[in-house]
Amino acid sequence: MKQQRQLRRREADETAELPADLPPLLRRLYASRGVRSARELERSVKGMLPWQQLSGIDNAVEILYNAFREGIRIIVVGDFDADGATSTALSVLGMRALGCDNISYLVPNRFEDGYGLSPEVVDQAKARGAQLIVTVDNGISSHAGVAHAKTLGIPVIVTDHHLPGDTLPDADAIINPNLRDCEFPSKSLAGVGVAFYLMLALRTFLRDKGWFDERNIAPPNLAELLDLVALGTVADVVPLDANNRILTWQGLSRIRAGKCRPGIKALLEISNRDPQQLAASDLGFALGPRLNAAGRLDDMSVGVALLLCDNLGEARVLASELDALNQTRKEIEQGMQAEALILCEKLERSSETLPGGLAMYHPEWHQGVVGILASRIKERFHRPVIAFAPAGDGTLKGSGRSIQGLHMRDALERLDTLYPDLMIKFGGHAMAAGLSLEEHKFEQFQQRFGELVTEWLDPALLQGEVISDGPLSAAEMSMEVAQLLRDAGPWGQMFPEPLFDGRFRLLQQRLVGERHLKVMVEPVGGGPLLDGIAFNIDTTCWPDNGVREVELAYKLDINEFRGNRSLQIIIDDIWPL
């Protein structure tokens, strides 16, 4: 039932003006990812976009400066994912380093409070003595919460990166690169990136006002927060444009050098990751899921506490707690995925083909895991997916993931225009969105969503593609090139890790674990013998001892085991020839 994906080779921009001393392979890879100049390859902090281009930031720092001077209580209100946790921790640590003593934080509980600065969350902040609320990674759609804070006399600064609606909340200051009047060139900052920029602007403002001189303290080195910026940016799967690559590279470099928070060190240990060899993908696939598990199954306050703590022993205890939650999440997800595949089979049987957009619901699914489920089903069937779970009181909460060619939030906005009573609320980005609706309206939503996607999407986009960087020569299949590629990142969303294709003789094949295919291959045209592994293989097709030759889509990788390093390939797709 899994779709067979088609291979397509990426095309390079022939007009790109890249440095002449770049190896030809890197020139090809960068040019095919839209890099047109050496400036876009800058990885030092001097290449960062200036904070002055963020609209609303001057107003925000003035409010914070006055709050610092008056000693009023600041409450940072975060979100229950990895971006929200890193944003919250960064803001608290940053303001403490800048000289604010009266600061605390509050992270809404996914199950009790829902997303964002709701009136109920404002009441919680008020109960904790809030005299100023600063939202991070949320707030742009919190009209009711901001209005409620106003009635209580609590000013609100909104920092967010989610797409705004037609109207903005009546906050005292709003910083969001996606505001219509904001000239900040990068629209891809994560919530933690916006929070970091606010700290940079605040430091400059405080320095100009003589704040540090008055207190006889040195302005803090805010680069110490870049490990959190890198983790939140990669974990939130925002596009790694030139500016986000700088932020991520700088954070990765600090982690590799051992200059990171104890909480990040503890996450690395429990994930069995070597800090010195850390790649951006490790942040997304090892650290991020463990941090996210707190918000998915329990309370993200555990994750924020981990990132804030200064003691490695305490951090290890908290990281162990997150690791256990992540294991539980995996078990829940596995069961939900099996149920989702049964639903897909029923849909296929009823209409011969799957709808262009899948909306699925099961009364026993877990609210905190539907986002991952939607992502898994999207990858399997290559079409937009929204998965729903019960939220109590006869309502459902859904999480959607999209494919290239369909802007998920725009699609929901169109549905809301066509059918105003269909959804209770919605929000999100191009590739991910969240929504809620009444349970009895699910079948209507399922039908309308499928129809809209079918109308909007070119059917060709539903045929899964493997986009390759082409073949490697035998000489390029080496440890040196693998290391070159590792160092050439950071790779990530919209700046994908290099993927190559080629024909190989299949010399050995066997299953390891339950679903991983271990192989030894040799390039058909000659070249080195290569060990390879394909994760989560379709075990109804592999191993197949009748297959002697295959076409592979693969990544060049370095396998590190017990101090030894060897060349291997990570196989994304395998086609028998």
Q: What spans do the regions from the language model cover?
A:
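Conserved acidic residues
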Residues: Q131, D172, E551
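Acidic-glycine-rich active-site phosphate/pyrophosphate-binding loop
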Residues: N66, D166-N176, I264, V521-P528
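Histidine/acidic-residue-rich, glycine-tolerant segments that coordinate divalent metal ions
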Residues: V136-V192
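Short alpha-helices
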Residues: L90, D170-D213, L225-V229, G428
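A short acidic, amphipathic alpha-helical/loop segment
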Residues: A144-H148, L373, E480
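A residue-level signal for conserved active-site and pocket-lining positions in enzyme catalytic cores
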Residues: Y30, V134, N292, L485, ...
